[in-house]
Swiss-Prot record:
HAMAP family: DXP_reductoisom
Protein name: 1-deoxy-D-xylulose 5-phosphate reductoisomerase
Cofactor(s) in the UniProt record: Mg(2+); Mn(2+)
GO biological process: isopentenyl diphosphate biosynthetic process, methylerythritol 4-phosphate pathway involved in terpenoid biosynthetic process
EC number: 1.1.1.267
Taxonomic lineage of the native organism: Bacteria, Pseudomonadati, Bacteroidota, Bacteroidia, Bacteroidales
Entry similarity comment: Belongs to the DXR family.
Pfam families: DXP_redisom_C, DXP_reductoisom, DXPR_C
Catalytic activity: 2-C-methyl-D-erythritol 4-phosphate + NADP(+) = 1-deoxy-D-xylulose 5-phosphate + NADPH + H(+)
GO molecular function annotation: 1-deoxy-D-xylulose-5-phosphate reductoisomerase activity; manganese ion binding; NADPH binding
SUPFAM superfamilies: 1-deoxy-D-xylulose-5-phosphate reductoisomerase, C-terminal domain, Glyceraldehyde-3-phosphate dehydrogenase-like, C-terminal domain, NAD(P)-binding Rossmann-fold domains
Pathway membership, UniProt: Isoprenoid biosynthesis; isopentenyl diphosphate biosynthesis via DXP pathway; isopentenyl diphosphate from 1-deoxy-D-xylulose 5-phosphate: step 1/6
Record keywords: Isoprene biosynthesis, Manganese, Metal-binding, NADP, Oxidoreductase
């Protein structure tokens, strides 16, 4: 029986690759809902090809453009962030792929869980901001959360069939495009250089986070919530080849790893198939092509990783604040307003001013996000070039 899929963020990197898989497997999937933030032209093309029941454009100023373009089709056209959260509750949706960027994915994910939709989670910030709340909601509503990030998909696969809790998670990181740059060189690293990831094809925001290792810090927090691990039980290993996507170590010293080419369509496909492996003709790993190497991350050159560990150890609303500050920092860097290393300096100053609340609730997270963004914006002028 075919599954009806909702894709939140269908015009982004994960969204377009999800549609690639659906296109090749029309006997398995139908597209029910597509959403985008601003990319009207691509959303229109996607809607005309996949004929969803509903499309939503978050930017309400572009509503009339898509409404006119799809007027000849029986597709409901909605607009606004609240409309995305409403659309995911449609009774006929089976699975929601949460591929929106950043904090914006939080409320739609909550609404989808409350509506008891299966979640294919590509929006790691949802668990960074509100991991305890999300996992409790998922448990209360008996909703499976299937990880789309390659690392968490690898851990999920390595844990299948295991009856005992793992001793440690070994979370691998490519190291990004700046792995071997000196501290001096990092100060002059450009946006264009940061966006040239050596292994992965990803969106701009996550690519910058990968370059700063903030992405790995957020993935550590995501792993903590998904797999019920403590931060000290998660080790980060730099693995430049991105062939081993992560590993799990058990109390007898055994280690299980999941390997594959660095292609996001693999973990997306695994999540869509709900652990059923969908055949494909993608390239296979050539184990003779290159050695597999590992090294420890340099926390002096890449302090964002330390900030993530600090935030999750503090708990409460600290990870939410870190995420908000990081979104402001990355946006400023992408606009060439601050330097690469100033992103970390901005995060440090924001977190020094952060007011910690232990309460875990949606109103707390909403207030923390808003307040932290305001603080980060107020500090930006001292870093602007």
């Amino acid at each position: 029986m075919k599954k009806n899929i909702a894709i939140l963020g269908s015009t982004g990197s994960i969204g377009t690759q999800t549609l690639d898989i659906i296109h090749l497997n029309p006997d398995l999937f139908d597209v029910y809902l597509l959403t985008a933030n601003n990319n009207v032209d691509l959303l229109i093309r996607q809607a005309r090809e996949y004929r969803p029941e509903i499309v939503v454009i978050a930017n309400d100023q572009k509503y009339h453009l898509i409404q006119e373009a799809l007027a000849d089709l029986p597709i409901k056209v909605w607009c606004g962030a609240e409309a995305i959260a409403d659309a995911v509750t449609a009774p006929d949706i089976d699975m929601v792929v949460t591929a929106m960027v950043g904090y914006s994915g939080l409320l739609p994910t909550i609404k989808a869980i409350e509506a008891r939709k299966m979640i294919a989670l590509a929006n790691k910030e949802t668990l960074v901001v509100a991991g305890e709340l999300i996992m409790r909601l998922a448990q209360d509503n008996q909703v499976p959360i299937l990880p789309v990030d390659s690392e968490h998909s690898a851990i999920f696969q390595a844990l299948l069939g295991e009856r005992q809790r793992p001793e440690k998670i070994l979370l691998t990181a490519s190291g990004g495009p700046f792995l071997h740059l000196t501290a001096e060189e990092l100060q002059h690293a450009t946006r264009e250089q940061a966006l040239r990831h050596p292994n992965w094809n990803m969106g701009a925001k996550v690519t910058i986070d990968s370059a700063s290792l903030m992405n790995k810090g957020f993935e550590m927090i995501e792993a903590k919530w998904l797999f019920e691990m403590q931060p000290d039980e998660i080790e980060i290993l730099v693995h430049p080849q991105s062939i081993i996507h992560s590993m799990v170590q058990f109390r007898d010293g055994s280690v299980k790893a999941q390997l594959g080419i660095p292609d996001m369509r693999l973990p997306i496909s695994y999540a869509l198939g709900i652990t059923h492996r969908i055949p494909n003709d993608y390239p296979r790993v050539d184990f003779t092509a290159t050695p597999l190497t590992f090294e420890r991350p340099d926390l002096e050159r890449f302090p964002n990783l330390s900030y993530a560990f600090d935030a999750i150890r503090l708990g409460g609303n600290a990870p939410c604040a870190l995420n908000a500050a990081n979104e402001i920092a990355v946006t400023a860097f992408l606009r060439d307003e601050i330097s690469f290393t100033d992103m970390s300096r901005l995060l440090y100053e924001v977190m020094e001013k952060h007011e910690l609340f232990r309460e875990v609730s949606l109103p707390t997270f909403i207030e923390t996000d808003s307040n932290t963004r305001r603080v980060a914006e107020s500090l930006l002028p001292k870093f602007r070039r």
